[in-house]
Each structure stands twice: as C-alpha cells, then as structure tokens.
Amino acid sequence: MPSVIRVRGARVHNLKDVDVDVPLNEFVAVAGVSGSGKSSLALGTLYAEGSRRYLESLATYTRRRISQAAKASVDEVAHVPAALALRQRPGVPDVRSTFGTATELLNHLRLLFSRVGSYLCPNGHRVPPSRNVALEVPLTCPECAESFYGLGAEEMAFNSGGACPVCEGTGVQRVVNRASLVPDESLTIDEGAVSPWGSLMWKLMKDVAREMGVRTNVPFRDLSDAEKAIVYEGPAEKRHIVVATKTGGAELDFTYFNAVATVENALAKAKDEKALARVEKYLITRTCPACDGTRLGERVRSTLIEGIDLGEASRLTLTELREWVQRVPGLVPDEVAPMARVIVDEMTEPMDRLVQLGLSYLSLDRASSTLSNGERQRVQLARAVRNRTTGVLYVLDEPTIGLHPSNVDGVLAIIRELLADGNSAVVVDHDTRVLAAADHLIEIGPGAGADGGRVIFQGPINEAFHAPASRIGPYMAGVRRVERAAGESDQGADIDGRGALHLETNQIHTVRPLSVDIPLGSLTAVTGVSGSGKTTLVLESLVPALRARLAGEPLPGHVRDVDAAGISRVNLIDATPIGVNVRSTVATYSGVLDELRRAFARTEEAQAAGLKPGAFSYNTGSLRCPTCDGTGQITLDVQFLPDVDIECTDCRGSRYGAQASQIRRDGLSLPAIMAMSVDEARVAVRGLKKAGAILETLAGLGLGYLTLGEATPALSGGEAQRLKLASEMGRRQDGTLFVFDEPTIGLHPDDVQVLLNVLQHLIERGATVLVIEHDLDLIRCADWVIDMGPGGGMEGGRIVAQGTPTDIAANEASVTGRYLR
C-alpha cells in the first residue's frame, strides 16, 4: 500500500519543478506567505489531478455534463486518491438555496412535519397526528369524517409541490416600481420620458402611444390623468403606425405595450444576468404577501406541531431549533413519538457539528447567497463529514477564514473525523493553531511570486518549530510575534484629547440598541464570534450613517444619531475581487499603464509610425494581439472535454502584437515591462516619476512579487485589499475613516506585519482606522477594541467589552479576551 502521494516536476503557476511526497491518511498542512504557491500545490496540482483522474474513469456521456479541471502542469502525480476541494470562495448559490437546503437539515424538518404534524382536513378541522401518513393511508377527520391524504416530505418542499403559488417558492415578489418608469417628468415622450420604452422595448412604442391618444410632444407632467393612465396601464391593442425609413416610410400594425407591461415582458424573457440587470432598475423586491416570505403554500403552512408551522420552525436559529426538536417527541401522541425520535436523532449530529463550527446563529430560512465565504465553506465542511466517505483526499483552502478563535477547535475536530474515516487531508492555512495541530508540514517559499514556488521545509510538525529555513516555525513556536511600532499599541484611546466618532442605534436584526465611541487617529478593532453583530454595527450602521450625514441625507432608519467628529471621508476597503475579467490587470488598475503608454508614444519609433498613447492599450489599441484581442489567452471548445483556456500562441500571453515588441524605450518594449514583477519594473521605469512612485507604493504594500500584466480577478482577497489601498498611500488622510472587513484574510503572519505597518502609515498621515477582525495578532496591536457578543444571533448583539487589548484580556465576559491572555 502506498503511503504517500508522489509529486514530481510540478510547474503550476509559480511552482519551480517541485518534487514532494505528501503523506496519505494524515493531516498535512501547507503554509507559506501570500503568493508563494501554496494553493498551486494543493488545489492546482493535488486536487486538480485527483478530481480529473476520477472523472476520467467515468463514461464520456457522463463527463460531458460535469465541469472538469484541466490537466495540471506536472511530470508525475502518483497514488493520488479521488479528491474533493473545499474552496476559499465557494460558488454563490442560486436564489432557491437556503442554509436549510445546503445543510440538508430542512429535509429532516420537512419529514418531521410530514410524519408527526397535525393536518387540517378539507373542511378546516384540525386532525391529530397519526401513523397513517407514514403508512400512506388516508387520514380521517374526527369531526366531519372527511378522508384525505397527508403530505409527503417532498410535497412540503418550496422547490416543488409545497411552493407558494404567488412567489413560486422564492419568498419574494419582484414588482414594477412605477416611480422609476418616468424618472424625469420635464421630458416629453418623444424625448424619452418613458425610460423602459428606450431601454427594454422598441423605440417606436412612442408612435403607438401617439395613436392611442397620448400627446408625445409635451412634458410628461403636463399630460392629463387619462393620458398618463394609458402610458402606465393602457390595453394591449393594435394600432396602425407609419415608421420612417431610409426610403421614405413603412406602414405597420403594432401592439401597444404600456410602461408596466414593457418591464413585466422583459422580466419574463430575461434568461441571463445581463438581461436581468437591464430590468432590475425598474423593479422593487418585497416580501411575498401571500406566504410572508416563508416560500411555502397554504396547506404546508397549515400543518402544525404544537402550534408551530414549518415556516416558523425554519426561522428559528440553529440553537433554538436544536432545543425545540428535542422536545418534539414528548409533544406528539405516543403513536408517532418513536418515529419523531428517530427523525430528531438523525438531525442531532449535523446540528451539533454546525454549532461546533460557530454557525449556531443561522436559521434554516437564511438565503445561501447572503452567507459569507467562510460560512459557506463551513457548511461544505460539515457536509463532507456527514457523508462518511473513505479513501478520499480532502483539500481545504483556508477553512478558518472568518472564524473566531473559539471555533477553530471545531474545525480541527472535523478534520480529525475525516482522517478517522480513512481519508487524507491537505489543509492550506495561516492560523498557527491549525498548523501546529497538523501531523506534517509542507512550507512553500521563501518569498512570493518569482521568489517563491519552492519547498523550503517538509517534515513532522514538531521539527518545523526550530527549522532554520521555515518562516512559519518561529510563529508556531511563539518566539516571534507580529508587533506594532514601539509605543503605538495598547496605549488606549485618547477620546478626550483626540475626540471620537459617536454612534447610537436602535435594534436591528439581533443587535440590541447600541451607543459606541470610536477614537479618532487610532486603530480600533471590532471583534466577536460569528453572528455577534460586528458587520451590522460597522457596515450596516456606522458606514451608511456617516456617508448619509456627510452627504446631508437622512440617516438609516435604525440609526438614532451619529457624530462625525471631523470625519469628512469614509473609505471602505474590502476583499472583493477587482474586476470581473482578465482585461483588468495590476498595471491598468494601479494606473502604471497610463504613464507607460504615454512614454512609449513619445519614442522616435512610435512618432515615426504615427502611434498615439491609445495605440498601446491592449484592450482597444491597434498594437494589441489580433488573435486573442488583448486577453493573452484563447479558449478552446473541445467536445467531450472541458473548455480549455490556453496561452495565446501568437503573443505568448503578452497581449500585444508583434509590432509592439519593435518599439523600445531604454531597450525595453512595453510587452517586456508588462511581464516584469513590480520589483523588476521599478528599475525599468526610470525617469517616469508617477509610475515609479506607484510601483514604490506597491512594493511597500508587500506586492512587489506581482507581475504588471497579472489579471486582478485572480488576486487573493488580501492582495486585492492592498492594491485598492495603493492610491491612498501617498497623501494626507486628515478627516478620513478607513474601514477594513477582515483585512488579514489569507495572510501569513509576515504579511500581517506588512499590513500592520501600512495601517500605521495611514494613522500617521492623519487617518482613523477601523477593522472588523478575528486575527489575534492584529487585535493585540490595536489601540482600542470593541468586543461584540457574547454569542452569535440572539445570544449576541451587545457590546461585551471596550478598551485596550489588555482590558479585553482581563474581562471575564469576553470570549475574545480568553485568547488574548
């Protein structure tokens, strides 16, 4: 029996012919600084090959219907099991997916209501629970003797027979927002007053309206009520119109679509996101009035267990639901109690595991699309364990993202369960507690990008603590820590001296009324377990309230008061990807390419050829590669196999045509500079003051390893945040509040140190910095901490403690404080 996965000559992304043996049936951690090549080894090599080879064993007909990974750039991967990946950014589910469907707990809950619920007979009488539903025989009403069948579990699903007929199981209604149909009533219909007729319908609809008796040459506000009624609600009647053409005119019989019908017609025909986006601006979304957002039909909602229906049970938090279902066997008649106990026992283990993973505050009706990446990944993790597979390689990409330190033990327990079932686990992570719990460590580095891609340590975890080559070992051993500049942290918030932002709110969601001060000119961390109210406090209350106050607009409804205290600008820096396609690169986003294009247009060769700066754009310029249109890659549609994106064979990924390589500045062409890293390009742009300053800033942000031509959507969350900060680094920040949402996501402790230096630079320039954070190293370095909790959901929503990190550590009520001691 092989004991290791044998990898030889791995060259995925920046890996440099890596040879490594990955132990099977063990907890293997993969570490390294951001951009070192960790994910390239774990996901790009091990998972890609494990999943691809498994899929290749399936029939061709089956493979056509499954998205497949391309073959990894590697010489040999031997003894790799079938692989499953739990990615850092799971796909966003559709509108019909909920926390209940994703965890499959809703399946059990539907079965419980189907089998032991109390039904209404067709005449409206309540019928007590009976085994008849399970036996598939009719129920008989004790009052009117009417016989009828109960509902099966599938018939209670909002994705099938149990759906509300009004909203079709979505829980919401999209209705036309009449106020958006005519945004400017000073315009005439001929001038485009009726907006959807211009963007969603043929423009000749105004001609049809004229034939319907509506004046189209007067301002809309001056139309009579009858004319406006025709515009908004007129009947779908045919009218004879004459349409101007190049040869004179054409006569047509055309059916009238009023403004509301135009939007409804476009919505019904929308088949993709692009089409839906065109319609969205004319719609408002509201809770379905028929089912009150439960998604369920009337008969499903009429089935009760001790006065609670399926919709109400789905709105309970996981903690509340766990307590309620345990009581159900004692609440129902003895006839069905054993059946209830079996169903409840099936629910108990998955619920306990989800609570262990810190998801106790979520309810089953919570839309999956509203869950964070970390929450969705933990749902995946819980499902993986419940499947009880064996012989599978699980590749976990940073499973502790967005996880409070108190829930890390839950993740580790699940990884151990996977191993106990006979599986192997490869975990990419930066959390030193996770790494220290592993059996084996593979560390990639030593640096990022071109400076990484090599194995700098491999072996048992205890050997890494003192290995000279390891960069993570000293952090795991506790001999090295992330530190802020001497004398800056833990000095407290000088609220009296510098002033403070002040916010007062009423209750919203599970967050109680709050009154909070955030010191100016300081680094403040907002902490707390998942669901404790951090996001609600900062992103749903403070940020929109400040922006409204600065714009002179009304405050959000739940905000009682906000004192901006001299803040004149709010800058939210989050980890969302930059751009949506490969045309956005580091050079374009940072502004470096703009100056490079102007510089190359000034060269003698360019002037002789009559080339302007626009010609050097790989998106629209004449010098872009004609084969790939400036994307650097082409997509091959191979039948029976997945689409393959390959490097453009003509430009070799440079995005430029051959002529661009002939135009040189200081001996270098623009394609050659675009292929350089930020650090390398700093030398190549000598004499270009603005470009040089931008590159210096990027290097100071720890992004020196990125290539100028690297597509921004491929950057990690941490890289995206720092790139967004680049434009802010060189100027005064007086009166600016920077808000960061978990800026340490995906960061190695060395990268956290770089980030902390950046935050300190902003503060020294006059800024106030507020971070939502779980990382203990950054929290220890804050001036002020606001700890939310103590739990998640209904058990949270309060400020448990405020003060310096030392104050929080000494507070017995603070869950975060326990991990700061």
Residue ranges, per PLM feature:
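Conserved phosphate-binding elements of NTP-dependent enzyme cores
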Residues: 1-821
